[in-house]
From Swiss-Prot:
Coiled-coil stretches: none
Protein's name in the database: Shikimate dehydrogenase (NADP(+))
UniProt organism field: Methylobacterium radiotolerans (strain ATCC 27329 / DSM 1819 / JCM 2831 / NBRC 15690 / NCIMB 10815 / 0-1)
E.C. code: 1.1.1.25
Family annotation (Pfam families): Shikimate_DH, Shikimate_dh_N
Cystine crosslinks: none
GO BP annotations listed: amino acid biosynthetic process; aromatic amino acid family biosynthetic process; chorismate biosynthetic process; shikimate metabolic process
Binding sites annotated in the UniProt record for shikimate: 18-20, 65, 90, 106, 225
Assembly and binders: Homodimer.
Binding site for NADP(+): 134-138, 158-163, 223, 246
Species lineage: Bacteria, Pseudomonadati, Pseudomonadota, Alphaproteobacteria, Hyphomicrobiales
Function: Involved in the biosynthesis of the chorismate, which leads to the biosynthesis of aromatic amino acids. Catalyzes the reversible NADPH linked reduction of 3-dehydroshikimate (DHSA) to yield shikimate (SA).
Similarity remark: Belongs to the shikimate dehydrogenase family.
Amino acid sequence: MSVATPRAFVVGHPIAHSRSPLIHGHWLAVHGIPGSYERLDVPPAAFPDFVRGLPDSGFRGGNVTIPHKEAAFALADTLTPRARAIGAVNTLVVGPDGRIRGDNTDAPGFCAHLDHSLGAAWPERAGGTALVLGAGGAARAVVVGLAERGLRRVWVANRTAARAEAVAALAPGVGAALAWDDLPAALPGTGLLVNTTSLGMKGQPPLAVDLSPLPADAAVADIVYAPLETALLAAARRRGLAAVDGLGMLLHQAVPGFEAWFGPRPRVTPELRDRIVADLAG
């Protein structure tokens, strides 16, 4: 392989489950780029040396997944404002000077998926109010993304109040913590409900939330994509609500990284989505 051949990676531990090589491999083929995108299984103890060695590795950068996102945040030479706000990095870019920039593309990826699924006017259609369930890393990205898109109020509900408060604080003046028991009272004023928990994922119990108090024009999004149709989304469709599955977030968050490493800005197309859906089904 030529030294000039662009190379990127996804690093995690474990990593065999990652669909990122399928996504980036598809785009490399579409754009006729003779590059590579590789899975790298790096345990936590070896991750600092891995990052420090990137400038001499031949890689232009790569994606970072569980359990390394917080470590990547600490090890990057520079951080985008979004990554700094979220406190985690999922994208590394090695600059011409060898300095490593850390970014978080989960926030714009989530919002780009909403644009694609609901139309660009979804913040106005939501009445400027969203309710985010969960307070983990995905919730942090979603809350920051929603605040960036101009929502006036983003409620964060979690069974542990302190965690909800910490995530809500990422969006000063916009975010606010909500006690889990207060969900029924908050739903009538919610234009967008987002599940960022693992509830509903294959092997996990379903998320038990009664959607009947939601307005008739509300939208429900779930970041879970295995299965694509969670019990939450099925319940939303039965009520006639707009339902947004989690696969699009995975696809759209990959766009900025590909552009940084390989040049062209790729498109998320039905063909790409169908390819990943088929892989999930297999």
